[in-house]
């Protein structure tokens, strides 16, 4: 492969699409707290002065959609019309129906283990040993930059920052190993009264330098900080936002393949979400076990059918045991039926709003990030 560049991007919690994701998952969490077996497919649309929450929800719970929406927007930091969006005065519209009984009869079973998949589809999971969290470096550091932006905005270090921001990091690879960072882009919404030079210096000192490892930065690294020169109009006033529009930011930054299904607003019976989490769990444990340096898992389902229609293990030539053996180990140690993976990862809890910004993978507090099966896999593979 020799030398190549690879780029990933992330967006902050105040990006319009991410506002939508967080509202959808806040609604999901509120429902799961009362009714863990609820069926939820919650979509959100945000635009200047307005939030529309819709979808299909079947539950015994009652939740206040308007209050959840306003609280979520408030926590993100849109609390004044000067920012282009205000949690206290925006309109909140609701258009929610029930899940189709045709889908329901394919999912529900007398024996929970025979619970069918809520839809057909294909999902991917990925892991690599190039970072401590077994994630690709470009997306990991892109996330950390916008997380840092939110941190210094909220703690008052840089009070002129506003919630909307984007990051992009280009890494240099040589023969598959990281040798440096080629380019960094960080665009952040800001108050009217900060000049470009002061903004660029502060972003470099308070956001970029504390996050990016100095050994990967050199004199040829290019920095683009608010390259348009002005970013006052942002958030839903700058662009409308929709749930499920940042699926590459949510996953591996383009380093792995994607089955196309979004995550936010979906309860765990939707394999788009739960099976993608399970595939990450499988891939991460394989890499943590030292059975491969990189691992990508594909799993697929038919609607109403419990057993996956396929399982694929790809290790890009980095495997320490054969692909056939890896596939057998996956089938032996991981139950990838919809109910099985819900139990395996304990998914019927209100844990989803936190996933909806800064990536669903690579943060150790989520159950699919555990490496508790690594030693079992290593022993079963016969590696010392």
From Swiss-Prot:
Question: What superkingdom does the record give?
Answer: Bacteria
Q: Which cofactor does it need?
A: Mg(2+); K(+)
Instruction: Read off the CDD domains from this record.
Output: S-AdoMet_synt
Could you mention a single GO BP entry for this protein? one-carbon metabolic process
The UniProt annotation puts the region (Flexible loop) at: 99-109
Catalysed transformations (reactions): L-methionine + ATP + H2O = S-adenosyl-L-methionine + phosphate + diphosphate
Q: What is its EC number?
A: 2.5.1.6
Sites binding ATP sit at 15, 164-166, 230-231, 239, 245-246, 262, 266
Q: How is the cofactor bound?
A: Binds 2 divalent ions per subunit. Binds 1 potassium ion per subunit.
Residues binding L-methionine, per UniProt: 56, 99, 239, 270
Cellular location(s)? Cytoplasm
Q: Which keywords does the record carry?
A: ATP-binding, Cytoplasm, Magnesium, Metal-binding, Nucleotide-binding, One-carbon metabolism, Potassium, Transferase
Q: Which GO terms describe its cellular component?
A: cytoplasm
Which of this chain's residues are annotated to bind K(+)?
43
Instruction: Spell out the Gene3D superfamilies in the cross-references.
Output: 3.30.300.10
Q: Which family does it belong to?
A: Belongs to the AdoMet synthase family.
- Purpose of the protein: Catalyzes the formation of S-adenosylmethionine (AdoMet) from methionine and ATP. The overall synthetic reaction is composed of two sequential steps, AdoMet formation and the subsequent tripolyphosphate hydrolysis which occurs prior to release of AdoMet from the enzyme.
* Assembly description: Homotetramer; dimer of dimers.
Q: What is this protein called?
A: S-adenosylmethionine synthase
- Specify the species: Salmonella arizonae (strain ATCC BAA-731 / CDC346-86 / RSK2980)
């Amino acid at each position: 492969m020799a030398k190549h560049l690879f780029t990933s991007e992330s967006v902050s919690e105040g990006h319009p699409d991410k506002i939508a994701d967080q509202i959808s998952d806040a609604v999901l969490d509120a429902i799961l707290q009362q009714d863990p077996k609820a069926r939820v497919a919650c979509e959100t649309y945000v635009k200047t002065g307005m939030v529309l929450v819709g979808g299909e929800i079947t539950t015994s719970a009652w939740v206040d959609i308007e209050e959840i929406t306003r609280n979520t927007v408030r926590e993100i930091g849109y609390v004044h019309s000067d920012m282009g969006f205000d949690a206290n005065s925006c309109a909140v519209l609701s258009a929610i129906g029930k899940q189709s009984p045709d889908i329901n009869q394919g999912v529900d079973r007398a024996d929970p283990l025979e619970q069918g998949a809520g839809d057909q589809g294909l999902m991917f999971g990925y892991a690599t040993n190039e970072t401590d969290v077994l994630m690709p470096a470009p997306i990991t550091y892109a996330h950390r930059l916008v997380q840092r932006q939110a941190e210094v905005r909220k703690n008052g270090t840089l009070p002129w920052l506003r919630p909307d921001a984007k990051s992009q990091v280009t890494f240099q690879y040589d023969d598959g190993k990281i040798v440096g960072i080629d380019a960094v882009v960080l665009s952040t919404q800001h108050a009217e009264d900060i000049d470009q030079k002061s903004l660029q210096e502060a972003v470099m000192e308070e956001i970029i330098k504390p996050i990016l490892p100095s050994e990967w930065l050199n004199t040829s690294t290019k920095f683009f900080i608010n390259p348009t020169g002005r970013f006052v109009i942002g958030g839903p006033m700058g662009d409308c936002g929709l749930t499920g529009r940042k699926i590459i930011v949510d996953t591996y930054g383009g380093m792995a393949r994607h089955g196309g299904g979004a995550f936010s607003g979906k309860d765990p019976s939707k394999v788009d979400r739960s099976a993608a989490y399970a595939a990450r769990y499988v891939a991460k444990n394989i890499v943590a076990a030292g059975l491969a340096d990189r691992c990508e898992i594909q799993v697929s389902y038919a609607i109403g059918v419990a057993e996956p229609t396929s399982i694929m293990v790809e290790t890009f030539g980095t495997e320490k045991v054969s692909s056939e053996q890896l596939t057998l180990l996956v089938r032996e140690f991981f139950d990838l039926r919809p109910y099985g993976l819900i139990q395996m990862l304990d998914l019927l809890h209100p844990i989803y709003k936190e996933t909806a910004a800064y990536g669903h993978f690579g943060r150790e507090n989520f159950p699919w990030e555990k490496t508790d099966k690594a030693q079992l896999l290593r022993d079963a593979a016969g590696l010392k």
